[in-house]
């Protein structure tokens, strides 16, 4: 029974910390970057142009003034360094939704420190993360990057992440401001959203992160918001972010997300990315001389760039430092913990889990023998290593049997790692030319040995290549382990031909089709088949030409340089036979794990999913296995919700996300009880896409998308209309039973590990007398605590009064904490594990700011 006097939930207002003063005075520098009148007359351009970027990842260095270059790197789940193409590997964290599922601010802080250490190893001063957009629907291509559909969970997670990054002197970047919640026509679409929804849902994560962590940088989104591109919206950048919230950091554009000269500068956009500049060279000089931009405004923009360079100099990272590997043992341990702590136990009827490592275990499914460790796009990462679910389970079990069941790939698995060069090295030879294949006696200007057969050329450069038009070949030898018909795939942003043993197998040059590859500028994967013999080395050769040689035209997408080429392939699988084999083994095996889901080809920047379904054939496999072995454990890997038409029949069901480098070990740790599952869903999982509140207004139509659900995003909608989803926000089971009393949390029924974690969620219900329609309840705070068997702990969760009670009053353009009796609900693991108490607000109060 809840006793009001025993509660330790504290509701209070908190003042933001002060922004640290600069280490040295920069006021005298700004004039050096402003074109002087004499310089204008002599047609020289000084400084304001110099404070922009030189390439995709660096700002200008100005040695005469002692101003160093600053290196910027992607991304939210790992520090890539300066190269997509043939880059240096890095540690890969679980995806954003996985981290949101942990509800663990301490873990996010530690992971932020890991990211900062990786940045230092890569010579980077600024990290482009975290991503804190809102998943208003399940189909967003970048939904996996963000933490949650809930703004408080998202903002608090971001604050802890940023604090960890800052702890080692690296500058985190909040992105993407704002409403970058879909990929369809992302540079052209206008998000039409009410001011109330903008404030309460979409800006709130940024507001909380800025208040609690003071990150040094912020990135604008590609899209428009109510008709104005975010990068040139003065109401958003100057009024809300700078004046109302007091943000002192730098505001940069997303890559090629600057669309104007004067409008962007006047709105408050400090840095155009990437370089060389399109809008801040002679065009900015012209805007200055024509009084479209004032000298003071330009000084303000320059000052912010200098302040950030100054701030990053404290980290002691040399200019243009070579990228290095880190890969420390302690980082592997932390990544494994993060992977396990992010896994949500959705169902566990009859206590099927945890599994017994002494028993023979059958592992089935398309995701069992691959590492679906990250989503696609700018969040993709070349990891130091990856662990598949099958590998993780094999480390636990005495006997493991594998059956494929079906394939789950959208594009064929990369072939590069299975090729060999002429000298027998693993991989293939990549040769670059300035002349096309028709040119006689052409010689390569560059020869590289590579293993990754997805070559995205955005940041490839060579002294002998000018412009984006050039040519390349990929050459290697493939020796199959089994004879049979193999399917090959060639995807290009450009044009390409694939030859096997001298014969043309794929023509992706003369007749091309639009696809979603390479951020939406590439083709579909064109496929061809060929019978290949085991033990024989087959010659594989790709003739590739860069993007300008293609006649395909694209609308509403970002063009990242010269394009790319992707080569995939695998043995063709008879779907019916593969399922039958898996089912037969399942019927004969007591302990069965089915690993299904998506990967970075299905969920990626550059496009949205057309539906919520799992890859073709997956549902048939799962149904058949459950029928043969009802105790089969179903493990789903996806960054956002998927349909599970067999969920009611499954006894044990686990949501495992994209778990980063240690994803396979994390899955095994939870399945076998070495880690007690404690994660909670950061997203609502609907039964069907039609049940989602954004269903009728998600994609761009005639250049706009209407946020018709208003503030009723995610669980706020399902609560309001009293519709039960498949799995609700905040759901997550444990192998242990917990009990709340007051805010004393007790572990009463330990079944697995000696230590268990419980997440306590704090929701607030508005007064019945509220003057506007409000969500039934909203998450306002949470706490994760560790417990030994039988232990009782008292938890204190502090929630600012404004965050707890306020809504945005559009009539007053202010927050309103309205008088009335609110209800605080404290929710633990289990449907009935809940406490409640009233909270009385005696006087209505308007407020602005943080």
From Swiss-Prot:
Predominant localisation class: secreted
**What do the Gene Ontology cellular component annotations say?**
extracellular region
GO terms classed as biological process = cellulose catabolic process; glucan catabolic process
Q: What class of enzyme is it?
A: hydrolase
Q: Pathway involvement?
A: Glycan metabolism; cellulose degradation
Molecular function (GO) terms for this protein are: beta-glucosidase activity
Q: What transmembrane ranges does the database entry give?
A: none
Q: Which reaction does it catalyse?
A: Hydrolysis of terminal, non-reducing beta-D-glucosyl residues with release of beta-D-glucose
Report the subcellular localization.
Secreted
Functional summary from the UniProt entry: Beta-glucosidases are one of a number of cellulolytic enzymes involved in the degradation of cellulosic biomass. Catalyzes the last step releasing glucose from the inhibitory cellobiose.
Q: What is this protein called?
A: Probable beta-glucosidase J
Gene symbol of the encoding locus: bglJ
């Amino acid at each position: 029974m809840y006793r009001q006097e025993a509660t330790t939930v504290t509701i209070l207002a908190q003042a933001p910390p002060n922004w640290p003063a600069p280490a040295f005075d920069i006021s005298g520098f700004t004039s050096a970057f402003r074109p002087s009148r004499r310089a204008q007359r002599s047609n020289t351009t000084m400084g304001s142009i110099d404070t922009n970027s030189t390439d995709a990842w660096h700002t200008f260095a100005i040695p005469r003034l002692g101003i160093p270059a600053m290196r910027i790197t992607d991304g939210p789940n790992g520090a890539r360094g300066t190269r997509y193409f043939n880059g240096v590997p890095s540690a890969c964290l679980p995806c954003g939704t996985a981290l949101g599922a942990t509800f663990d601010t301490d873990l996010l802080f530690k992971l932020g420190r890991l990211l900062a250490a990786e940045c230092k190893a890569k010579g980077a001063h600024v990290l482009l993360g975290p991503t804190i957009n809102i998943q208003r629907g399940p189909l967003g291509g970048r939904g996996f990057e963000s933490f949650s559909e809930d703004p408080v969970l998202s903002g608090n997670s971001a604050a802890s992440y940023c604090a960890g990054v800052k702890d080692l002197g690296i500058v985190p970047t909040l992105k993407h401001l704002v409403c970058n919640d879909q990929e369809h026509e992302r540079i052209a679409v206008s998000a039409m959203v009410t001011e109330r929804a903008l404030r309460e849902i979409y800006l709130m994560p940024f507001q909380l992160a800025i208040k609690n962590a003071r990150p040094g940088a912020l990135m604008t989104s590609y899209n428009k918001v109510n008709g104005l591109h975010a990068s040139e919206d003065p109401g958003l950048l100057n009024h809300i972010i700078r004046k109302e919230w007091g943000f002192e950091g730098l505001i940069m554009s997303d890559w090629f997300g600057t669309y104007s000269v004067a409008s962007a500068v006047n709105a408050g956009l400090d840095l155009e990315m990437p370089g060389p500049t399109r809008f801040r060279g002679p065009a900015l000089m012209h805007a200055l001389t024509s009084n479209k931009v004032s000298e003071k405004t330009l000084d303000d923009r320059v000052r912010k760039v200098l302040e950030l360079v100054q701030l990053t100099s404290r980290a002691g990272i040399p200019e243009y430092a070579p990228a290095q590997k880190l890969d420390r043992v302690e980082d592997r341990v932390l990544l494994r913990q993060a992977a396990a702590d992010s896994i949500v136990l959705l169902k566990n009827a009859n206590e099927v889990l945890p599994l017994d490592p002494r028993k023979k275990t059958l592992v089935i499914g398309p995701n069992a023998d691959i590492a679906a460790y990250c989503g696609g796009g700018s969040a993709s990462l070349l990891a130091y290593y990856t662990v598949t679910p099958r590998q993780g389970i094999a480390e636990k079990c005495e006997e493991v049997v594998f059956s494929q069941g079906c394939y789950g790939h959208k594009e064929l698995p990369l072939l590069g790692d299975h090729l060999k060069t002429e000298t027998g090295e693993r991989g293939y030879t990549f040769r670059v030319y300035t002349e096309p294949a028709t040119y006689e006696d052409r010689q390569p200007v560059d020869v590289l040995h590579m293993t990754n057969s997805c070559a995205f050329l955005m940041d490839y450069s060579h002294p002998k290549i000018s412009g984006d038009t050039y040519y390349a070949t990929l050459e290697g030898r493939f020796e199959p382990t089994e004879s049979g018909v193999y399917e090959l795939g060639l995807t290009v942003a450009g044009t390409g031909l694939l030859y096997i043993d001298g014969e043309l197998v794929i023509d992706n040059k003369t007749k091309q089709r639009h696809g979603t590859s390479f951020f939406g500028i590439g083709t579909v994967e064109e496929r061809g088949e060929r019978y290949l013999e085991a033990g024989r080395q087959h010659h594989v050769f790709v003739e590739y030409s860069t993007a300008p040689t293609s006649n395909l035209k694209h609308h509403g997408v970002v063009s990242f340089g010269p394009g790319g080429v992707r080569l995939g392939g695998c043995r063709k699988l008879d779907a019916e036979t593969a399922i039958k084999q898996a089912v037969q083994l399942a019927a004969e095996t007591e302990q069965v794990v089915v690993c299904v889901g998506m990967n970075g080809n299905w969920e990626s920047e550059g496009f949205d999913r057309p539906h919520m379904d799992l890859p073709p054939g997956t549902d048939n496999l799962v149904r058949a296995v459950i029928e043969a072995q009802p105790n089969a454990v179903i493990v789903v890997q996806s960054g956002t919700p998927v349909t599970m038409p067999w969920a009611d029949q499954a006894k044990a069901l686990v949501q495992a996300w994209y778990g980063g480098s240690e994803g396979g070990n994390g899955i095994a740790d939870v399945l076998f009880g070495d880690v007690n599952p404690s994660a909670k869903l950061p997203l609502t999982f609907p039964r069907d896409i039609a049940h989602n509140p954004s269903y009728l207004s998600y994609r761009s139509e005639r250049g706009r998308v209407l946020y018709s659900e208003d503030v009723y995003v995610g669980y706020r909608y399902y609560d309001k209309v009293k519709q039960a989803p498949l799995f609700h926000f905040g759901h997550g089971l444990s192998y242990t039973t917990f009990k709340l009393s007051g805010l004393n949390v007790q572990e009463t029924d330990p079944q697995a590990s000696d230590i268990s974690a419980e997440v306590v969620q704090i929701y607030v219900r508005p007064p019945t007398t509220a003057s506007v329609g409000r969500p039934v309840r909203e998450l306002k705070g949470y706490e994760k605590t560790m417990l030994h068997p039988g232990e009782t702990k008292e938890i204190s969760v502090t929630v600012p009064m404004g965050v707890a009670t306020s809504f945005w009053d559009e009539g007053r353009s202010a927050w309103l904490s309205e008088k009335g009796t609110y209800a605080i609900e404290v929710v633990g693991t289990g449907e009935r594990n809940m406490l409640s108490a009233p909270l009385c607000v005696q006087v209505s109060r308007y407020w602005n700011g943080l």
